[in-house]
UniProtKB/Swiss-Prot annotation:
Residues 1-18 form the signal peptide. This is Extracellular metalloprotease PODANS_2_14170. GO terms for molecular function: metal ion binding; metallopeptidase activity. Its EC number is 3.4.24.-.
Length: 293
């Protein structure tokens, strides 16, 4: 999903990591999940509930045991910069490793591990600016691995976005859906970056959640199926900051899940996925990525 982030003043562009950018709100700019994908999620919800009920009847499993499948993902990181300067988006190896560590720590409690399969750095001013429309050209040149492997692209400019990613789908090798798969992320959201309040590396965590098939916690608002995950409380709209106690759907159970990685809270507010989201990740993984070529 794409996060809207107002552009920093031009004078700050050359001092990207040295001077923090002022904090600004953001919102999703990517297309909503398709009706077909929403129906898939609702079917998963039915199947997951049946499996959980059966596990309790048998007395063999707890709620978390249902999601015990371990998932291991190869990751390819691509740094796409306008120049070899840090202000041009040219992340250092230390920054890359720190970002990778954040991903590992965020997903490890849910049975998901990552292996850094490769990194590369490309200097191309056109590719480094997502707003110029070179996404597919860039990805045709840089993408590696199979559909079950995660490609992360860190760009200098995102046209006002923090990042976006694509949901799992049926994708044959060489198809548009296959090539564009992965996450594109603003370089300054990496740990220690200049995107104030969004520089602990959790933009990547949020985007990878989409790659695994998770929707925003506020998907669908207060009515209907929402994000189709039973243990994420209904939420009318995205959070801003870290509004503890916010309850945007007072007629529904629970307060807003502001600490969930799939809300729009600031990085320091993020803490968790839910067991239901873990189950959903497993459902999408098994159906779309696990055996993909």
């Amino acid at each position: 999903m794409r996060f809207s982030l107002a552009l920093a003043a031009a004078g700050l562009a050359q001092t990207a990591f040295a001077a923090p950018q002022p904090s600004r709100g953001f919102g999703c700019g990517a297309p909503e999940p398709s009706e077909e994908l929403l129906q898939v999620s609702q079917q998963f919800a039915v199947e997951e509930a049946q499996a959980l009920a059966e596990s309790y009847r048998s007395g063999n499993l707890t709620a978390r045991d249902v999601t015990a499948q371990a998932i291991s993902v190869k990751v390819y990181i691509h740094v796409v910069a306008a120049s070899t300067a840090l202000s041009g988006g040219y992340l250092t190896d230390t920054m890359i490793n720190n970002q990778f560590s954040v991903l590992q720590s965020a997903f490890a409690p849910y049975g998901i591990s990552f292996t850094l399969a490769g990194t590369d750095k490309t200097v191309n001013a056109n590719w480094a600016d997502d707003s110029k429309g070179y996404e597919m050209t860039m990805k045709r040149a840089l993408r590696k691995g199979t559909y079950k492997d995660l490609n992360l692209y860190f760009l200098q400019k995102m046209g006002g976005n923090l990042g976006y990613c694509y949901f799992p789908t049926t994708a044959s090798p060489g198809s548009t859906a296959y090539i564009r798969d992965g996450c594109t992320i603003l370089y300054s959201t990496t740990p220690g970056g200049s995107s104030t309040n969004y520089n602990l590396g959790h933009t990547a965590t949020h985007e990878v959640g989409h790659w695994f098939g998770l929707y925003h916690t506020f998907q669908g608002g207060c009515t209907g199926a929402g994000d189709s995950v039973s243990d994420t409380p209904a939420q009318a709209s995205a959070s801003s900051g870290c509004p503890v106690g916010r309850d945007s759907c007072p007629s529904q159970a629970g307060v807003d899940p502001i600490h969930n990685y799939m809300d729009y809270s600031i990085d320091s507010c993020y803490e968790e996925f839910t067991p239901g989201q873990q189950t959903r990740i497993n459902s999408f993984w098994t159906s779309y990525r696990q055996n993909a070529s």
